[in-house]
Amino acid sequence: MRLADARVAIEGVNLEIDGGRFAAKVVAGWEVAVEADIFCDGHDSIDAAVLHRQRGTDDWTEVRMEFLVNDRWQARVTFAENAFHELTFLAWRDLYTTWRKEVAKKLAAGQKIDLELEEGRRLLQSVETAGAEDRALVDRILGEDGADQEAGARFARMSSPEAVAAMKRCAPRTNLTCYKILPIFADREAAAFSAWYEMMPRSQSGDPERHGTFDDVIRKLPYVRDLGFDVLYFTPIHPIGRVNRKGRNNSLTPGPDDPGSPYAIGSEEGGHDAIHPELGDFESFGRLVEAAHAHGLEVALDFAIQCAPDHPWIREHPEWFDWRPDGTIKFAENPPKKYEDIVNVHFYRGALPELWYALRDVVLFWVEKGVKIFRVDNPHTKPFPFWEWMIGEVQSQHPDVIFLAEAFTRPKVMKRLGKVGYGQSYSYFTWRNTKAELIDYLTELTTEECRHYMRPNFFANTPDINPVYLQHSGRAGFRVRLALAATLGGNYGLYNGYEICEATPVPGKEEYFNSEKYQLRAWDFDQPGHIQDDIRLMNHIRRTHPAMRDFTRLRFYDAHNDSVLAYGKSTEDKQDFLLFHVNLDPHAAQTFEF
């Protein structure tokens, strides 16, 4: 397009991420507001349209835009398929509407409009793409028009609602401007709206002396579904290394029966594409996935790119790892912390491209086993280019695969992970406890540009994080954080033990004492004081109210008490609206005015 042709300006596109470098995220089947600033020099009227299509197809779907205010235009668009899409804009000078508005003003002022009516005839004659009905309508208007007729009647005929509609469909698009093509990815709904329940399969036997199996997990499925969850997330299920194995409470002196951390992946039994033999085999895993689906649950797996020192890859591909000057392999560190049972891979030098292919193939392997959701451990410590490539490779074949970024790191890093392809992200919700903190953070997530590429998943706790708030708040605090997590966000999650208000900490730390990361546990979820009914209620509200699905519909309201958070959610048509008042003080009742 020549510079002189770009007379109509198109800018400020809401679904344009970094100039089109990254795809904005939408949900397949959900209507989305597509907006842009569109304007022209002078006072001429303009018109605009959005064009969209599924990537790889030829035909565009056109949706006309509507003027909002201050040169802002909007179209309501639905991307039907879970797939990659493309989006662009057209804008042009609307000479017919300009003529109609100007002549109406002159007629109202009593001015002669004979020449203007002739100009109107010529505009009507200029229709280019009219169908048979529109062509017949225009011909009839022109045929009924005559210079001897009263000017007002002639203008009324030329500007009738039928004429306006026909000209909107088929009038020439003068000074047509086309915007660049932007990428869009339409996720399936579970990327934006899901309730996760996290467990360690090895602790599901009911006996702290017996390693759990997939069959034990199958017996727990009715319980998880009865609570109202739809995603069942497992920590790593692979063989656990024996070299430098950790003991209870992360000790360096394990006992002979200590199971080790499931994040120390790999042993002589296999690596990331193998199953811990005490859990079961691929046949029993397949039965588990099938049984979960029958209960309305999806299985999510932990994808942790790290290896135990006895992982087969270290022997088979030493070039994928870092080695110290004395010839020993370098274990993972985050000074002053050390992770003696874990070795990190190196993504460049001799590891490129074979390691990248191997990791992609691990994900595809589990996809073929029926897993379509992956929680990724510490993605912020791996290269952004790898994630962009790997997620793109997987979703080009399986667009229904969802990746959750377990990244508790700097804001810009978390947002970059969303841009490169992650459908969900852990968030700072875990540490936002006061009214001001929650309002500020949720306002950022729901109103700023990041809402188009970063979807938070509000986990109230994790195996690694025993929040200080929960350590000191008792049962009431667990109910508070449950209500906030389940109703503020579209995605939220609980790690098992939450329902019995488990909060015993390692003194002075946000960690669980006797964490099942390092030992088998047996849980009694029916013990006195449990909050199962609260969880069921929250998930029932989420399932039965359409307003709960889109977290960007969140709005905060006045409650004149710093311990009371007031907020609501509604559907676009306001047919479903929920108002929440949450007492953030777990120790005392509160009153408020609003």
Curated annotation (Swiss-Prot):
Residues at the active site: 377 (nucleophile), 406 (proton donor)
Enzyme class at the top of the EC tree: transferase
GO biological process: carbohydrate metabolic process
Site (Transition state stabilizer): 464
Keywords per UniProt: Carbohydrate metabolism, Glycosyltransferase, Transferase
Residues bound to alpha-maltose 1-phosphate: 246, 306, 341, 378, 517-518
Transmembrane segments: none
Source taxon at top rank: Bacteria
Gene3D superfamilies: Glycosidases (3.20.20.80), Golgi alpha-mannosidase II (2.60.40.1180), Immunoglobulins (2.60.40.10), Phosphotransferase system, lactose/cellobiose-type IIA subunit (1.20.58.80)
Region (Disordered): 244-270
Pfam families cross-referenced by the UniProt entry: Alpha-amylase (PF00128), GlgE_dom_N_S (PF11896)
Reaction catalyzed: alpha-maltose 1-phosphate + [(1->4)-alpha-D-glucosyl](n) = [(1->4)-alpha-D-glucosyl](n+2) + phosphate
Function: Maltosyltransferase that uses maltose 1-phosphate (M1P) as the sugar donor to elongate linear or branched alpha-(1->4)-glucans. Is involved in a branched alpha-glucan biosynthetic pathway from trehalose, together with TreS, Mak and GlgB.
Assigned protein family: Belongs to the glycosyl hydrolase 13 family. GlgE subfamily.
Subunit field text: Homodimer.
Protein name as it appears in the record: Alpha-1,4-glucan:maltose-1-phosphate maltosyltransferase
Organism listed in the record: Cereibacter sphaeroides (Rhodobacter sphaeroides)
